[in-house]
């Protein structure tokens, strides 16, 4: 639960119905169903997810079935918070889909909340964003607008990640990486998933490989 202190900080001014920290990579369907039951039992009317792609993915799984809106506070550069794409894993088979219900209503980007993300994880996460950008250039619905966003995302990530490697506390580098991650997600959501991303989903779901590192 490395993000719990950050979550406590983020939610300090709101009434929290329940805290839920049972987050698992690739969102196993059992984990998703348990989280849905917690949300319904506690009459949750807003999901605030603080963390990386797995945390956002779990919130999306809850929203998919319940329609509860999401406020996402990302602490990595995965970009999932800015897409309408969901993913669930059952018996080592990962299924993904698109639904407007899983697109967060609000996303809060704060570079200071990413300062505790280790350099190695920061780079892997940023390369996941880079993969979103590359897929956006040739995915099924790629177009000039997607390409422009993806190109800017690549430039931002390429500028920010080396600064983070050089100084993990570089706000400038973290700002650029978050900006690039957002652009990568928006372009990816519009263009659709290319073969590269689908392969990573299959490998990740089958062999339980971490998504960001698989891309990297």
Show where each model-derived region lies.
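A glycine/threonine-rich phosphate-anchoring loop and its flanking beta-alpha core
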Residues: 64-148, 152-153
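Active-site segments that bind and position negatively charged phosphate/pyrophosphate groups
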Residues: 136, 140-216
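ATP/NTP phosphate-donor binding region
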Residues: 1-46
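Structural motif
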Residues: 17-18, 45-48, 69-71, 105-107, ...
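A short, small-residue-rich loop immediately preceding and capping a beta-strand
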Residues: 39-62, 66-77
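Short, well-ordered alpha-helices that flank and scaffold nucleotide-derived cofactor binding pockets
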Residues: 12, 37, 60-64, 190, ...
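Short glycine/serine/threonine-rich phosphate/pyrophosphate-binding segments
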Residues: 3-6, 29, 54-61, 79-83, ...
